[in-house]
Swiss-Prot record:
This is Nucleoid-associated protein lp_0699. The lineage of its organism: Bacteria, Bacillati, Bacillota, Bacilli, Lactobacillales. Residues 1-24 are annotated as: Disordered. Belongs to the YbaB/EbfC family. One of its GO terms (cellular component) is cytosol.
Length: 102
């Protein structure tokens, strides 16, 4: 009977340790920055790991008052590129904790 309690305590310790590691890795991931770019680097955006936009750079050549749609498309492309990078790194870093839980 006591042996089962020891195993339970050990398992709880391991779970707390894993939770602390997961929290630390998530915090580190949130501090990283990810830059996405539109074709020809006409627009670049930078996000943090928790998907907060930090910066946007627009090449002056991308600004054409007669073609606002192109600039909008470039911004969307850059944002999607950056967010894809965030998602890929998040999966790479945090996936080991969720493997088998899906």
């Amino acid at each position: 009977m006591m042996r089962g309690m020891g195993n339970m305590q050990s398992m709880m310790k391991q779970m707390k340790k894993m939770q602390a590691q997961m929290t630390a890795e998530q915090a580190a991931l949130n501090e990283q920055t990810f830059t996405g770019a539109a074709p020809d680097d006409m627009v670049k955006v930078t996000f943090t790991g928790d998907k907060k936009m930090k910066d946007i750079t627009i090449n002056p050549d991308a600004v054409d008052p007669d073609d606002v749609d192109m600039l909008q498309d470039l911004v969307v492309a850059a944002v999607n590129d950056a967010l894809t990078k965030v998602d890929e790194q998040t999966q790479s870093t945090m996936g080991k904790y969720t493997k088998g839980l899906q």
